[in-house]
Design a protein with these regions (language model features):
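Catalytic cores of large soluble enzymes that bind and process phosphate-bearing ligands
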Residues: 2, 6, 26, 30-31, ...
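N-terminal small/glycine-rich loop or linker at the start of catalytic domains
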Residues: 51-72, 119-123, 170-172
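Active-site mouth loops of central-metabolism enzymes
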Residues: 62-81, 99-100, 128-134, 177
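Catalytic domains of carbohydrate-active enzymes, especially glycoside hydrolases
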Residues: 83-98
Length: 195
């Protein structure tokens, strides 16, 4: 019974009711589901895709990268390289592989194999999935990967370690990507302020 055009006010009302339930996990996801449904409703009512409703340009395509390079028993460097080549053959213009589960030396061999398979012009992203437990371990590994020009290193530490991510960002030339589990503007404000 509320006006869906007031999605920002409705979000604030829902969020203010979460103080006793926690502002993480399923509570925030539920608010997000309602919020997305409201934006979808008003943009469809206007006869526009959401990006146009919000004033963005008309777009025909969205760039996508292939996320692969998972660790699998028996997977060789040659298998990894072949997998990367298949993604390029499928039309992807960038790829992402997992790192952090092996020693820095062994993971560097994986990064090298992926880079050599796709060449220097294809962006190669690395996803550590919070693999390193301290900044020094992350810096050691990332320092070894940098020879292969990664486009970014994703989630090198636990997501809550904002200062650790900031220290890594200041210490390496590879951009640090983080925030996939963060859910509110306040979370992202902390990340931005920490650089």
């Amino acid at each position: 019974g509320r006006d869906p055009h007031q999605s920002e006010q409705l979000w604030e009302e829902m969020y203010s009711e979460t103080i006793l339930h926690g502002r993480r996990g399923s509570v925030i996801r539920a608010i997000s589901a309602v919020d997305m449904a409201l934006w979808d409703l008003v943009s469809k009512a206007a006869g526009l895709p959401l990006n146009r409703y919000l004033g963005g340009p008309e777009i025909d395509t969205v760039p996508a990268y292939a996320s692969g390079g998972y660790y699998a028993g028996g997977k060789t460097l040659e298998d990894l390289a072949a997998e990367m080549c298949r993604y390029i053959e499928m039309g992807f213009t960038a790829i992402k592989i997992k790192v952090g589960r092996l020693s820095p030396e062994d993971d560097t061999l994986r990064v090298k194999a992926a880079r050599e398979a796709v060449g220097p012009d294809i962006p190669l992203f690395l996803d550590a999935n919070n693999a390193w437990k301290d900044t020094n371990s992350a810096l050691e590994a990332i320092g070894m990967f940098e020879e292969y020009d990664p486009g970014w290193i994703e989630e090198p530490l636990m997501p809550d370690d904002i200062q650790g991510h900031a220290e890594i960002s200041r210490s390496v030339r590879t951009p640090v990507a983080t925030g996939e589990i963060h859910a509110t503007r306040w979370d992202f404000q902390q990340l931005i302020e920490a650089n």
